[in-house]
Amino acid sequence: MNNRAGRVFRTCISISFVIVFAFTSFGQAVNRRQLAEQVKTEFLHAWNGYKEHAWGNDDLKPLSKSFHNWYAEPLLMTPVDALDTMYLMGMKGEADKTRKYITDTLKFDKDIYVQNFEITIRILGGLLSNYQITGDKKLLAMADDLGTRLLPVFDSPTGLPYKYVNLKTGKTRGEVTNPAETGTLLIEFGTLSKLTGKPIYYEKDKRALVETYDRRSPIGLVGTNINVETGKWTNTDSHVSAEIDSYYEYLLKCSILFGDADCQSMWQESITKINTYLADEGENMSKKNVNGPVVLGELWYGHADMNTGKRTATTTGALDAFF
């Protein structure tokens, strides 16, 4: 093949690749748009059902077309949860009306005991994310008010948070809790500190996270349940399933979000230990590089006693499998 023929051949091949890539990319883009519209349609179906049958309450019960509230008084769980999704889907008109309803209606001066963990990740987190999207200072003021009402949970002898707090009186209860509820708060409380300039939120929850980590076993694992007044474990089953999973998740996320070196160190140590004692497939080890340990992902994670590493279960759940 002479030079001219070679150039023509290479040009034709290049054009072919460009055409294939263009049509493939176009098809993928169209498919993504179609999928996005399908998701939006399903969201609207659920949202309109909530508006028709459960407006002003926490949740829709779709089969009975009625509503459910988590506590004696509603806290608008669904509207707060859904608001940032509306903005991300481009539903600004509906979102603005919902935001006004939330800021006009939702009050926290209620004589009810709430679960600190759920209220933090759903209501406090929802208010903060929507403030960051909209810049509506009413949302930040509401988050600050709620955060202040939640702070008494940290007033235990250990600094580990109680499970429940009364939003009006500040009284607490629920001394037996779990690592997910003691260690899955720092993103929300830390963000509240950054946005309000009040370090107390970050400091209180950072201490709770560290106190949880410091009570790990000699082989580096945490248990399922702990007493916040004594600091003693009441259930030594260790795993990455419900009641523990998000504790590990927040160690990593907080190291990234806040650049917290302590969280990074706790994460690296923790993931190494759970890969050593809980992972069922793969090499069960960490490799090293110049920047520190590189943890190998595993397919299955089991349950083991936090002190001995001896297996305590023979079944695996979804969270264990996809950690």
Report the location of each language-model feature:
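Intrinsic-disorder/low-complexity regions
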Residues: 1-2, 319
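Bacterial N-terminal signal peptides that target proteins for export
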Residues: 2-15
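Intrinsically disordered low-complexity regions specifically enriched for long asparagine
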Residues: 5-6, 26-28
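Bacterial N-terminal signal peptides
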Residues: 12-24
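Glycan-recognition and catalytic cores of secretory/periplasmic carbohydrate-active enzymes
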Residues: 27-322
